[in-house]
C-alpha cells in the first residue's frame, strides 16, 4: 500500500497556521507541531516542566506509523520500566483510535500488526535493551545467553568483598608492599583495618563503570590531573578568573554593608571608626589586587596573593551590623585556604603520583577479577551488560550495521538523565542523523546515578549554534500549573540559574508560560507561600549539628495549614502532597499528623525492614540456629514471645556457670547439672525442656531443608506468624515475616546456599548501615501523600508543600579524601611526612594532610555540580504544583531580616553568594531581599511557636458513630438489596463471558495447546498423559554413581549449543565441540549431549546441508508475537514464543525445530508437535506474507537422529 509522505518545513508551517486558526479547545503549540513532524535530521526537544513532552512523543510515533514506519523499526528508550509501560498503553490507545478512522483495509491491517507488535518492539529501558543484545550476541564475547542479573546490592557486596580480600592480601605481600601499605594508610590513617581504603577502591570502581569504557578511562584519564597540574603555570585560567571574581564580589558586598544606615562609620567626634577604616582598606586592596593581578602577581604569585589576602581580611567569616551577622568573607576564605600553601603542596604532590599509579593498578586488577568472578557465577550487574553490549557493537561491524539499518529512528526520553554509557549506546545504534531526544536539563537530578547533564547541554549548544548538526526545538508552554505557580517559579530561577550554577541560563526561552486560558486566571488566595517557623536559634545554617529531619514545630505548622485547607476550602487530603529531600528521618511528620488526625501515606521504599521488631526476632532465631554460642542472639530468642523467658528465668540460668557460653548454661539447666541446679524451678525446667526439644528440632531440620521451609516451620511451630497478627499494625508485621521467607528463598535461588551464608549477608547489610525496603501493604485512598522530590518527578499534585527547605545540602562527597572528575581523573588529599622540614627532630614523624591541586580543582568542580543539581531539584519540586505551592522552613525574623540583601550581578545573585549558600531557603530569601522592589509572586510569612498550640491547629473531625435512630442515614436494608442485585448481575456476566474472563492475555505455543485442548480441533493438540511403550528394558541402576538427567536442562543446553555453533558453508565437528565448551550448563548435562548426532545432521541430512548452503538466509532463536482469537468468547489474546530456526527464501520459508524428547516411533512426536509447528508457521506467514512454509522436526532423542517433515 502507499503511505503518506513525510512533511517538509513548508508543510509543517501550513499545519501550524491551520492549528492556530482552528476552533479547538486545546490547540497544539507551533513548537509541539514542529517536534511531531520534523523529519530528516537529529532533533533535540528541550521540554520544560508540564509542556507535554509525552504527548509529543506519542504523537510523533503514531505519525511515523501512519507514514508506513513499522513499530519494530523504532528504538524508544525510556528512563524507567513504568514509563515504558505507560508509553505502550498510550500508543495502544492512539492506534486503536486510528484503526476506527482508517479508510482502507490495507491501513487497518498494517495498524493491527503494529498494535500486536508493540509488546515485542524495542520500547523500554536501556538496561532491558542491552540485555537483549547480550542474550542474542553475547556468544561473540563468550557470554552465555542464560545469565542472571545481580540486582541485590547485598549479593554484589558478598562477591566484591571476597574478591577485594584476596587481592588485598596479594598486594600486601607483593613486590610493592611497602608503597601499598603507605597508600592504604593515606586513606585509612591510624585505623587498624583497611575499610576506608576499600571504600575508596569501590568508589573509583563505581565511577569508572559509569563511563562507556571503564578500562580505557582508568588507563587514560584516571591520572590525567595528577600528571598535568604540577606547578603554578598549569592552573587553569578559569580558576584564576573565578578567584578574582570572588575578590570583586567580596569588595562590593563589604562596600554595600558599610553604606547601610545601621553601619557605624563615624565616632561621636566625627572620626572614622577603626572598623570602618579597616573595611575601607580591605575594599581598596581587594579591588586593586583583582584589577592589577597580572602586573602584581601572575599565576606564579597566586600563593603570595592568597597570603596577602589572609593578612588583610579577618580570620572569621562574619561582619556584624546591628546584631546581624553577614558571612562576607566565607567564600573568599574557602577559595584561598588551599592556594596559600601551593608551594609546599607542589613540593610533596609528586610523591603521591606513584601511590596513585599503585591505586590505578589495584582498581584495574580488582575490576578484572571481580568480572571474572561474575563470569564464573554467570551473574552480572547492569553496568556489565551495558559494557558487553557496547563492546559487541563496537567490535562487530555487521551487528552494528544490522541495528543501524533496522532503526528508522532512535528515540530517547528523559535525555537529560543519560549517562555516558547510555549515550555511547545511542551513538552506536544511530546512523548519525536519525536521533530524536526529549528532555529538560533543568530537571536533571540523577547525578548520584552518574547521569551527566552536560551530554544534553553539549547537544543543546551545538544545535543552537549550528542547525545543520540537528534541530533544536524548545517547548516552554506549561499545561499543568496555574499562573501563581509559574510566576513564582520564574521569578526565583531567573535570578538563580545560569551556566555556572544550574548548567543553563534561565532566560526567556526557558521561562514557563501558561499553555491555556484556564491557567492564566488569577486566584489571589493561591499565591505561593514561604512559611517559616520563627525561631531564635543562633547560626542555624552554620550549625554542623543541624538535624536533617523536620522539627516537630515545623510539622505542626504544616498540619495547621492542611487542616485549614481541608476545613475552610474543602480540599480533599488526596489533593495534597508533601515533598522531602530524603525518605529517611521523617518520623516527626508521621507522629504529628497522627496526633491531629490527618491521614498520611508515604511513597514506600523506607529502608527500615531489618529493624522491625518481628524481623529482628526471626533473625536472632536464625542466628541462634546457625550458632547457638551467639549469646546475644540466643538470649533474644529466649526472651522473645516464642518462648517467653523473663529476666528472673534468664538470671537463674546464667548463674549455673560463670565462664560458659549461655547455650551451655541452658544445657546444664536442662540436665540439672549446674552449680545451682536447685534454683531451676519446675516451671522453669518445663520451659527449658520445651525450648531444648523445639530448638534441636529446628537445628536438625535446617541441615536437610531449605531456608524457606525452615522459616515457615518456625512460624508454624511457635504460632509466631499468628501472634504478630494480633498486634498493632498486624498486616504490616505479617507482610514483613512473609517477605523474610520469600527473600530467603530468593537468596538460595541465586546460588548462595545455606543458613550461615544468609545470616552473613544480612549482617553485612546491617554492618554497612544499609537495610532492605519495607513491604508494601494496602493504603488509604483519601490521604495526604509524602514522597521524595526524586519520586515526584514527572507527577503533578494540586497542592504541594516542599518541607525542610532550611536543610543543608549534603556536601559529604566534597570532604572525601578522594574526589573524581570525569575529565581530569583523580585528586586526593595526600598525607605527607614533613619531619625533615623541622630544624630539630622533636618528633618521630610529622604527618600533614594536604589538598593536592588536582583535588582542589576537582573539589570546586564537584561543589558547583552539587549546587547545580540541588538548584534543579528545587525546580523539579516547585513545578509539581498545579494550584498552590508552599515552601516550609525555619529562620529568625529579627536576626535575618537584612541578612540576604545582596548586590545583583547581571540580574542574578552574585556567583560567590550562590556558591556559599547551602539551603533552598538561602536562595529563596536572598532572591526575595535582593529583588524586593520587583514583583516576585511569593510571600514570606513567619509563624511563631505561640501560633502552633493545639487550640490554634485544630483537629480533623473524627468520623461519627453509626446512629440507628437516624432513618435518613440508616439505609442498610436498601443497600443490602441493591448489593444483592449487583452481585446477581455480576454472576450473570461471569457466566456469559466465562471463557473471555478465564482467557489469559498472553500465552506461549505450549500453553495455547494445553489451554485449548478441549475446544480446538487441531490434529495432534492433545495432552499425552501416558505413552505406551512397545518394550520394557528393566535395569537396576547403580545408585552410588547414577544421577537422573533433567530433560529440561538437556533441552535448554541443546538449544543453546545449536545457537552457538558458528554457521558457515561447512560446519565441522571442531565447530560443534568449540560451541559446546561455551554452553552454560553443568558438565553432566554437556556430557549427555550426543554431538555425533548433530554432526551427522550437518554432514549427512539434506536439510542440514541445505541450511549450510543458505546460511545467509538463516534466522535462529527468533522471537515472535501473534494476535489470536478465542473461538468461544471471541476475545483476542497474544501468543508469544521463540522459533528455533528458519530459512527465509524468496518465495518460501523452511521452518525447523529441535526436539530432545525420548521416542521410539518418530510419528509420536510428529503428532505431538503438529499444533505447535502450525502456530509457528502461522506467525511466519503473517510476518512475511509468504504462503509456502515447509516444516521440519529435528529429533535428537532416539537411537539415531531423525528429520521428520510435517504436513
From Swiss-Prot:
InterPro entries: AddA (IPR014152), DNA_helicase_UvrD-like_C (IPR014017), DNA_helicase_UvrD/REP (IPR000212), P-loop_NTPase (IPR027417), PDDEXK-like_dom_sf (IPR011604), PDDEXK_AddAB-type (IPR038726), Restrct_endonuc-II-like (IPR011335), UvrD-like_ATP-bd (IPR014016). Keywords: ATP-binding, DNA damage, DNA repair, DNA-binding, Exonuclease, Helicase, Hydrolase, Isomerase, Nuclease, Nucleotide-binding. Its EC number is 3.1.-.-, 5.6.2.4. One of its GO terms (cellular component) is DNA helicase complex. It catalyses: Couples ATP hydrolysis with the unwinding of duplex DNA by translocating in the 3'-5' direction; ATP + H2O = ADP + phosphate + H(+). Transmembrane segments: none annotated. GO terms for biological process: double-strand break repair via homologous recombination. GO terms for molecular function: 3'-5' DNA helicase activity; 3'-5' exonuclease activity; ATP binding; ATP hydrolysis activity; double-stranded DNA binding. Residues 26-482 form the UvrD-like helicase ATP-binding domain. Pfam families: PDDEXK_1, UvrD-helicase, UvrD_C. Residues 510-794 form the UvrD-like helicase C-terminal domain. The heterodimer acts as both an ATP-dependent DNA helicase and an ATP-dependent, dual-direction single-stranded exonuclease. Recognizes the chi site generating a DNA molecule suitable for the initiation of homologous recombination. The AddA nuclease domain is required for chi fragment generation; this subunit has the helicase and 3' -> 5' nuclease activities. Heterodimer of AddA and AddB/RexB. Belongs to the helicase family. AddA subfamily. This is ATP-dependent helicase/nuclease subunit A. It comes from Streptococcus agalactiae serotype III (strain NEM316). The lineage of its organism: Bacteria, Bacillati, Bacillota, Bacilli, Lactobacillales. The gene is addA.
Amino acid at each position: 500500500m502507499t503511505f503518506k509522505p513525510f512533511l517538509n518545513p513548508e508543510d509543517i508551517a501550513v499545519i501550524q497556521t491551520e492549528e492556530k486558526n482552528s476552533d479547538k479547545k486545546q490547540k497544539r503549540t507551533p513548537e509541539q507541531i514542529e517536534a511531531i513532524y520534523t523529519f530528516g535530521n537529529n532533533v533535540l526537544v528541550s521540554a520544560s516542566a508540564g509542556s507535554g513532552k509525552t504527548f509529543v512523543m506519542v504523537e510523533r510515533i503514531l505519525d511515523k506509523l501512519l507514514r508506513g514506519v513499522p513499530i519494530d523499526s523504532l528504538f524508544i528508550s525510556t528512563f524507567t520500566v513504568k514509563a515504558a509501560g505507560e508509553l505502550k498503553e498510550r500508543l495502544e490507545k492512539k492506534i486503536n483510535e486510528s484503526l476506527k478512522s482508517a479508510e482502507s483495509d490495507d491501513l487497518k491491517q498494517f495498524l493491527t500488526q503494529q498494535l500486536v507488535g508493540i509488546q515485542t518492539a524495542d520500547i523500554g529501558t536501556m538496561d532491558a535493551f542491552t540485555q537483549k543484545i547480550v542474550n542474542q550476541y553475547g556468544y561473540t564475547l563468550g557470554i552465555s545467553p542464560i545469565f542472571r542479573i545481580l540486582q541485590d546490592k547485598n549479593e554484589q557486596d558478598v562477591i566484591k568483598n571476597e574478591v577485594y580480600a584476596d587481592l588485598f592480601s596479594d598486594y600486601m605481600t607483593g613486590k610493592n608492599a611497602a608503597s601499598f601499605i603507605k597508600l592504604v594508610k593515606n586513606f585509612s590513617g591510624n585505623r587498624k583495618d583497611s575499610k576506608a581504603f576499600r571504600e575508596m577502591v569501590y568508589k573509583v570502581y563505581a565511577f569508572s563503570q559509569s563511563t562507556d569504557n571503564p578500562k580505557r578511562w582508568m588507563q587514560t584519564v584516571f591520572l590525567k590531573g595528577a600528571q598535568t597540574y604540577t606547578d603554578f603555570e598549569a592552573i587553569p585560567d578559569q580558576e584564576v578568573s573565578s578567584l578574582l571574581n570572588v575578590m570583586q564580589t567580596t569588595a562590593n558586598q563589604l562596600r554595600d554593608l558599610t553604606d547601610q544606615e545601621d553601619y557605624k562609620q563615624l565616632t561621636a567626634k566625627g572620626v572614622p571608626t577603626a572598623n570602618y577604616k579597616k573595611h575601607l582598606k580591605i575594599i581598596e586592596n581587594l579591588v586593586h589586587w583583582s584589577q592589577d593581578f597580572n602586573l602584581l602577581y601572575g599565576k606564579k604569585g597566586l600563593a603570595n596573593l592568597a597570603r596577602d589576602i589572609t593578612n588583610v581580611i579577618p580570620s572569621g567569616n562574619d561582619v556584624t551590623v546591628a546584631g546581624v551577622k553577614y558571612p562576607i568573607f566565607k567564600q573568599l576564605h574557602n577559595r584561598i585556604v588551599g592556594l596559600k600553601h601551593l608551594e609546599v603542596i607542589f613540593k610533596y604532590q609528586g610523591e603521591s603520583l606513584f601511590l596513585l599509579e599503585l591505586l590505578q593498578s589495584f582498581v584495574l586488577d580488582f575490576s578484572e577479577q571481580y568480572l571474572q568472578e561474575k563470569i564464573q557465577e554467570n551473574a552480572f550487574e547492569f553496568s556489565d551488560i551495558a559494557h558487553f553490549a557496547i563492546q559487541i557493537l563496537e567490535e562487530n561491524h555487521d551487528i552494528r550495521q544490522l541495528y543501524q539499518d533496522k532503526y528508522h529512528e532512535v528515540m530517547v526520553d528523559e535525555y537529560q538523565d543519560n549517562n555516558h554509557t547510555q549515550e555511547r549506546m545511542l551513538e552506536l545504534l544511530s546512523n548519525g542523523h536519525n536521533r530524536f531526544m526529549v528532555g529538560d536539563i533543568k530537571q536533571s537530578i540523577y547525578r548520584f546515578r552518574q547521569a551527566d547533564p552536560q551530554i544534553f547541554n553539549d547537544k543543546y549548544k551545538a544545535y543552537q549554534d549550528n542547525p545543520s548538526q540537528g534541530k533544536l526545538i524548545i517547548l516552554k508552554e506549561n499545561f499543568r500549573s496555574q499562573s501563581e505557580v509559574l510566576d513564582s517559579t520564574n521569578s526565583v530561577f531567573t535570578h538563580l540559574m545560569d551556566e555556572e550554577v544550574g548548567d543553563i541560563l534561565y532566560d526567556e526561552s526557558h521561562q514557563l508560560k501558561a499553555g491555556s486560558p484556564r491557567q492564566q486566571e488569577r486566584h489571589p488566595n493561591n499565591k505561593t507561600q514561604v512559611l517559616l517557623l520563627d525561631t531564635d536559634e543562633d547560626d542555624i545554617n552554620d550549625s554542623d549539628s543541624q538535624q536533617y529531619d523536620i522539627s516537630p514545630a515545623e510539622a505542626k505548622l504544616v498540619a495547621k495549614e492542611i487542616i485549614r485547607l481541608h476545613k475552610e476550602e474543602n480540599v480533599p487530603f488526596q489533593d495534597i502532597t508533601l515533598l522531602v529531600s530524603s525518605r529517611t528521618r521523617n518520623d516527626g511528620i508521621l507522629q504529628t499528623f497522627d496526633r491531629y488526625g490527618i491521614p498520611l501515606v508515604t511513597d514506600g521504599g523506607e529502608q527500615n525492614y531489618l529493624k522491625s521488631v518481628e524481623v529482628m526476632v526471626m533473625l536472632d532465631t536464625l542466628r541462634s540456629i546457625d550458632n547457638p554460642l551467639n549469646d546475644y542472639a540466643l538470649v533474644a530468642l529466649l526472651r522473645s514471645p516464642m518462648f517467653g523467658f523473663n529476666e528472673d528465668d534468664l538470671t537463674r540460668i546464667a548463674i549455673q556457670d560463670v565462664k560458659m557460653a549461655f547455650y551451655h548454661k541452658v544445657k546444664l539447666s536442662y540436665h540439672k547439672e549446674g552449680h545451682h541446679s536447685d534454683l531451676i524451678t519446675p516451671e522453669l525446667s518445663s520451659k527449658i525442656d520445651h525450648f531444648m526439644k523445639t530448638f534441636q528440632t529446628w537445628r536438625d531440620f535446617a541441615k536437610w531443608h531449605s531456608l524457606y521451609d525452615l522459616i515457615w516451620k518456625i512460624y508454624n511451630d511457635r504460632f509466631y506468624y499468628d501472634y504478630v497478627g494480633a498486634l498493632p499494625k498486624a498486616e504490616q508485621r505479617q507482610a514483613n515475616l512473609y517477605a523474610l521467607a520469600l527473600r530467603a528463598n530468593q537468596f538460595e535461588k541465586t546460588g548462595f546456599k545455606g543458613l550461615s551464608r544468609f545470616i552473613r549477608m544480612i549482617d553485612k547489610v546491617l554492618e554497612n548501615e544499609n537495610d532492605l525496603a519495607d513491604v508494601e501493604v494496602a493504603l488509604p485512598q483519601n490521604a495526604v501523600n509524602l514522597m521524595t522530590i526524586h519520586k515526584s518527578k514527572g507527577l503533578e499534585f494540586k497542592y504541594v508543600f516542599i518541607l525542610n527547605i532550611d536543610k543543608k545540602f549534603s556536601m559529604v562527597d566534597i570532604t572525601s579524601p578522594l574526589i573524581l572528575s570525569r575529565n581530569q581523573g583523580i585528586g586526593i588529599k595526600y598525607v605527607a611526612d614533613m619531619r625533615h622540614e623541622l630544624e630539630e627532630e622533636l618528633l618521630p614523624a610529622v604527618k600533614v594532610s594536604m589538598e593536592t591541586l588536582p583535588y582542589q580543582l576537582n573539589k570546586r568542580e564537584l561543589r558547583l555540580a552539587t549546587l547545580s543539581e540541588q538548584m534543579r531539584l528545587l525546580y523539579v519540586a516547585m513545578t509539581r504544583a498545579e494550584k498552590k505551592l508552599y515552601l516550609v522552613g525555619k529562620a529568625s525574623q529579627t536576626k535575618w531580616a537584612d541578612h540576604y540583601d545582596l548586590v545583583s550581578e547581571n540580574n542574578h545573585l552574585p556567583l560567590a553568594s550562590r556558591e556559599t549558600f547551602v539551603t533552598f531557603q538561602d536562595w529563596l530569601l536572598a532572591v526575595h531581599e535582593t529583588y524586593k522592589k520587583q514583583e516576585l509572586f511569593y510571600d514570606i510569612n513567619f509563624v511563631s511557636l505561640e501560633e502552633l498550640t493545639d487550640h490554634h491547629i485544630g483537629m480533623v473531625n473524627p468520623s461519627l458513630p453509626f446512629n440507628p435512630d437516624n432513618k435518613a442515614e440508616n439505609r442498610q436494608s436498601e443497600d443490602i438489596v441493591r448489593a444483592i442485585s449487583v452481585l446477581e448481575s455480576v454472576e450473570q456476566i461471569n457466566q456469559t463471558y466465562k471463557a473471555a474472563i478465564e482467557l489469559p492475555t498472553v500465552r506461549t505455543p505450549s500453553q495455547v495447546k494445553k489451554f485449548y485442548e478441549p475446544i480446538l480441533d487441531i490434529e495432534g493438540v492433545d495432552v499425552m498423559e501416558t505413552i505406551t511403550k512397545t518394550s520394557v528394558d528393566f535395569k537396576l541402576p547403580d545408585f552410588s554413581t547414577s544421577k537422573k538427567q533433567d530433560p529440561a536442562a538437556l533441552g535448554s543446553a541443546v538449544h543453546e549449543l545449536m545457537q552457538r555453533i558458528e554457521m558457515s558453508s561447512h560446519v565441522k565437528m571442531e565447530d560443534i565441540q568449540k560451541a559446546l565448551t561455551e554452553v552454560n550448563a553443568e558438565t553432566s548435562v554437556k556430557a549427555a549431549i550426543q554431538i555425533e548426532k548433530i554432526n551427522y545432521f550437518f554432514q549427512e541430512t539434506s536439510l542440514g546441508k541445505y541450511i549450510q548452503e543458505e546460511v545467509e538466509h538463516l534466522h535462529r532463536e527468533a522471537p515472535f508475537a501473534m494476535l489470536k482469537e478465542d473461538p468461544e468468547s471471541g476475545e483476542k489474546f497474544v501468543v508469544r514464543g521463540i522459533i528455533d530456526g528458519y530459512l527465509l527464501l524468496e518465495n518460501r520459508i523452511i521452518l525447523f525445530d529441535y526436539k530432545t524428547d525420548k521416542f521410539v516411533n518418530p510419528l509420536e512426536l510428529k503428532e505431538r508437535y503438529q499444533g505447535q509447528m502450525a502456530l509457528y508457521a502461522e506467525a511466519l506467514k503473517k510476518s512475511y506474507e509468504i504462503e509456502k512454509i515447509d516444516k521440519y522436526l529435528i529429533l535428537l532423542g532416539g537411537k539415531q537422529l531423525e528429520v521428520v517433515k510435517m504436513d
